[in-house]
Amino acid sequence: MTGVFPGATAGRDVASYTVVGAPLDASTTFQPGARFGPRRVRHLAATYDDYDHHTGAGFTDLAVYDHGDVHPDSDVDGYLSFLRALLSEELDDGRTPLVIGGEHTVSVAGVRAADPDVFVCCDAHLDLRESHRGNPLSHATATYHALEVADRAIVLGARTGSEAEWERAGREDVTVVAPRAVPDWEPPAAVRDGRTYLSVDVDAADPSVAPGTGTMEPFGLASRDLHDAVRAVAPHAVAFDTVEVNDRDDGQSGALAAKLLRAFVYEHAVSG
């Protein structure tokens, strides 16, 4: 591991949250570099104040532990199984996982560990492909695999996908909230009353906000939209990840992901 997430000062035995780096970068289809995401997010989180005026909480008081990175090998399926087992142990011990990717495929491990009723994902892409370029464990299949576990998926900010993906998104177990509608979106009863997994793919943001990601897509969300969505879902979530940050910008994407992770913890701890 390169560094510890700033403010993650708790020991594992007393922690309420566990940061886990998952630097998988196996199926990136345009700009690689997601392997640097965990290191970059940790580094860029160092600029933020401990105190959160929205909740009145200090990050260092919220019992966050940093497990370090779980490094992948060439066996992606085996890696996801190992990561799932680790996250399951954290959940069983009462700690909320905070996964930093890595490509979006790592969400598959998180969802399998958390066994949610609802998968809420901020993403530019539908990620509903059964496989991509012959790979069934591609970053473009994250929501498809989430629906093998969850009863419902809500994709905030999606604006692109294949024809087959849009057809799949038309079924009743998928809700797509267009970027222009996200500022007015509120978590439905399924999120408020069930087990929810929250995933934030940084490419949900407009490229002007977060250019350091594998597959940019214009006309995306403002950083404030993402912040408000994360805070709205956090009290109802059992696990969180932020994914697809790479090293191909001046830090905008990593800084955004770090801020959103912190916002999740503040709101989950105080309102959850």
Regions of interest found by a model, annotated:
Residues T2-G272:
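Conserved alpha-helical scaffold segments that buttress catalytic/binding sites
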